[in-house]
């Protein structure tokens, strides 16, 4: 699958900025399949299938977070269920790995369309 620059252009921030991912960054993002897909296969959240990883759902998550997992509404910490804080699989992920995974999550809806996140 060859991804042109248009597809590899993903949101950078909430002010409308974008960034073009390199093919190497796209490849590194496949770390998602190793580290996250057990609970988020295809961008669907195993524990709450009403909340996926599609851009619209991510935009509505409050507060914005990456390293402190909470429920979608931000009310409850979920570090006791598989997450970055508790699972052995996440202990070796660096900030660069997390960035690559986040880029993958932003790229997938552009690659697979509405299949990502189950919507």
Curated annotation (Swiss-Prot):
One BP annotation, GO: photosynthesis
PROSITE patterns assigned to the protein according to its UniProt record, in alphabetical order: CYTC
Key word Transmembrane present: no
Cofactor: heme c
Membrane topology listed for this record: Peripheral membrane protein
UniProt-recorded Gene Ontology molecular function terms: electron transfer activity; heme binding; iron ion binding
Entry superkingdom: Bacteria
Keywords: Electron transport, Heme, Iron, Membrane, Metal-binding, Photosynthesis, Photosystem II, Thylakoid, Transport
Record-listed heme c binding positions: 36, 39-40
Pfam families associated with the record: Cytochrom_C550
Cell compartments where the protein resides: Cellular thylakoid membrane
Cofactor note: Binds 1 heme c group covalently per subunit.
Main location: membrane
Keyword Metal-binding: yes
GO cellular component: photosystem II; plasma membrane-derived thylakoid membrane
Task of the protein: One of the extrinsic, lumenal subunits of photosystem II (PSII). PSII is a light-driven water plastoquinone oxidoreductase, using light energy to abstract electrons from H(2)O, generating a proton gradient subsequently used for ATP formation. The extrinsic proteins stabilize the structure of photosystem II oxygen-evolving complex (OEC), the ion environment of oxygen evolution and protect the OEC against heat-induced inactivation. Low-potential cytochrome c that plays a role in the OEC of PSII.
Family statement: Belongs to the cytochrome c family. PsbV subfamily.
Quaternary structure note: PSII is composed of 1 copy each of membrane proteins PsbA, PsbB, PsbC, PsbD, PsbE, PsbF, PsbH, PsbI, PsbJ, PsbK, PsbL, PsbM, PsbT, PsbX, PsbY, PsbZ, Psb30/Ycf12, peripheral proteins PsbO, CyanoQ (PsbQ), PsbU, PsbV and a large number of cofactors. It forms dimeric complexes.
UniProt protein name: Photosystem II extrinsic protein V
Organism (species): Aphanizomenon flos-aquae
Gene of this entry: psbV
């Amino acid at each position: 699958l060859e991804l042109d620059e248009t597809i590899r252009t993903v949101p950078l921030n909430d002010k409308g900025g974008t960034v073009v991912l390199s093919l190497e960054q796209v490849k590194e993002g496949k770390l998602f399949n190793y580290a996250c897909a057990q609970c988020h296969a295809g961008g669907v959240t195993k524990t709450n299938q009403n909340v996926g990883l599609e851009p619209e759902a991510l935009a509505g998550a409050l507060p914005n977070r990456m390293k402190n997992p909470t429920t979608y509404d931000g009310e409850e910490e979920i570090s006791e269920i598989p997450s970055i804080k508790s699972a052995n699989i996440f202990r070796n992920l660096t900030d660069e790995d997390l960035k690559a995974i986040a880029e993958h999550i932003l790229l997938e809806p552009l690659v697979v369309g509405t299949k990502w996140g189950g919507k």
